[in-house]
């Protein structure tokens, strides 16, 4: 398999993996081995184009059992072209038209908007490369907004003051996922498709790569520095947790109990800044690692169906998480293991995804509503407030505060856009 075809096959798998739960579970179209691509397609002028170009490395399951809006289909074709699909403009337009007509969007939960005292302003920027699928955003102290261009295989940056954007192509297969900056301003990422951790020297534009010492650690996910400058990271499907010493380049990998099936995912530190806490995507657990002994302690969450995408930590060292499987927002007490849950505004199918904490308020996005909804929860009053994301959101997979504490950086993967949600002063109009 060529490098390009391998990349396309990984993309196809990831596209199917992030379909809404109802689309994954309630499969309507059954395989048919007699059909090109393994699944039947409706008749249409571009049917053969789809069969010829969308089955190079995978079958058509991701298409026939998907749930996409016209805008989603447009961006899907852009992403595939960005990754190297061999189709010209005319063919791409024909494929988009066929997919939109043949596979209309199915019903999704409607976002519930709750009024409240906080006012926000949404700003957004498109990535220079169409179909880049920015996975994670990063707001740096100098005011820049960075993103991981997963399908474009680059790291990008925009200046919110001027709108000027720049992309830094990664010279090897990377599929960048999570991003974090160090004290010198370098940008580090998890090479989700390249089994490495990468570092971009912003001053020179040069990359340095740290390959995983075990080939099973194929998909580094979320990186985060501790207070001592050690980079910790999760390896989702490989089932590892890892840490990298930037001074020596040494990487230590270890399997938490039950991995790889549990799939380590989100990663956070409490106020001590040394002991990492992480969630599993494959089970209903939160775990922590003793940084001195590497002993892992796990906490089983009350609902066996709980699945966590992202987490946030408030100043009282409470861990908050959105339960992707049931639409709830929950608080986890690391000292006792106690959990308290709140029903999210848009209900059990809303699929909370990106999450962060700003001034001890929890902000997250309901990713399965159309459009996506931005939600704010005040732990003091135990009240929600929510807004529609004007551009639609396109699944906001991660978010973080801006350096001044007055905004939230977001990535809108399905739209190939990044944005900042400005939290306005209380006296603003």
Language-model regions, residue ranges each:
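Blade-level signature of beta-propeller repeat domains, shared across WD40, Kelch, NHL, RCC1
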Residues: 394-429
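Short loop/turn segments that connect beta-strands within beta-propeller blades
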Residues: 159-163, 201-205, 245-249, 290-294, ...
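Conserved beta-strand positions in repeat-built beta-propeller and related beta-rich domains
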Residues: 145-151, 187-193, 231-237, 276-282, ...
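Electrostatic cytochrome c docking/interface patches
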Residues: 24-49
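Beta-rich, blade/repeat-based domains predominating
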Residues: 130-141, 172-184, 215-228, 259-274, ...
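Beta-strand-rich domains and repeat architectures in extracellular enzymes and scaffolds
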Residues: 123-154
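The canonical Cys-X-X-Cys-His
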Residues: 51-61, 95, 99
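C-terminal capping alpha-helices of c-type cytochrome domains
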Residues: 83-111, 143, 408
């Amino acid at each position: 398999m060529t490098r390009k075809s391998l990349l396309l096959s990984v993309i196809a798998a990831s596209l199917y993996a992030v379909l809404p739960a109802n689309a994954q579970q309630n499969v309507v179209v059954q395989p048919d081995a007699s059909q090109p691509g393994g699944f039947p397609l409706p008749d249409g002028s571009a049917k053969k184009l789809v069969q010829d170009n969308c089955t190079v490395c995978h079958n058509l399951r991701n298409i026939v059992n998907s749930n996409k809006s016209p805008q989603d289909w447009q961006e899907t074709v852009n992403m595939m072209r960005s990754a190297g699909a061999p189709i010209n403009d005319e063919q791409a337009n024909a494929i988009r038209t066929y997919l939109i007509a043949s596979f209309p969007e199915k019903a999704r939960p409607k976002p519930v908007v709750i009024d409240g005292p906080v006012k926000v302003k949404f700003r957004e920027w498109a990535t220079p490369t169409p179909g880049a699928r920015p996975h994670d955003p990063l707001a740096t102290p100098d005011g820049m907004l960075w993103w991981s261009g997963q399908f474009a295989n680059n790291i990008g940056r925009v200046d919110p003051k001027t709108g000027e954007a720049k992309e830094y192509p990664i010279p090897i297969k990377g599929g960048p996922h999570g991003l974090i900056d160090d004290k010198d301003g370098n940008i580090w990422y998890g090479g989700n498709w390249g089994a490495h951790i990468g570092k971009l020297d912003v001053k020179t534009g040069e990359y340095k790569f740290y390959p995983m010492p075990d080939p099973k650690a194929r998909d580094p996910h979320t990186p985060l520095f501790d207070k001592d400058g050690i980079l910790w990271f999760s390896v989702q499907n490989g089932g590892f947790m890892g840490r990298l010493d930037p001074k020596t380049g040494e990487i230590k990998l270890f399997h938490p109990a039950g991995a790889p099936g549990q799939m380590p995912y989100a990663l956070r530190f409490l106020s001590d800044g040394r002991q990492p806490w992480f969630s599993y995507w494959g089970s209903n657990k939160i775990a922590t690692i003793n940084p001195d002994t590497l002993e892992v302690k796990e906490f089983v969450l009350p609902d066996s169906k709980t699945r966590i995408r992202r987490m946030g930590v408030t100043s009282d060292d409470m861990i908050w998480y959105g339960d992707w499987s049931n639409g709830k927002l929950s608080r986890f007490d690391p000292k006792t293991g106690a959990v308290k849950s709140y029903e999210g505004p848009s209900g059990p199918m809303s699929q909370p995804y990106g999450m962060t904490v700003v001034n001890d308020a929890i902000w997250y996005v309901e990713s399965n509503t159309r459009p996506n909804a931005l939600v704010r929860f005040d732990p003091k009053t135990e009240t929600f407030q929510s807004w529609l994301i004007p551009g639609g959101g396109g699944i906001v997979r991660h978010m973080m505060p801006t350096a001044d504490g007055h905004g939230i950086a977001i990535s809108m993967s399905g739209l190939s856009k990044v944005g900042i949600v400005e939290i306005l002063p209380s006296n603003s109009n």
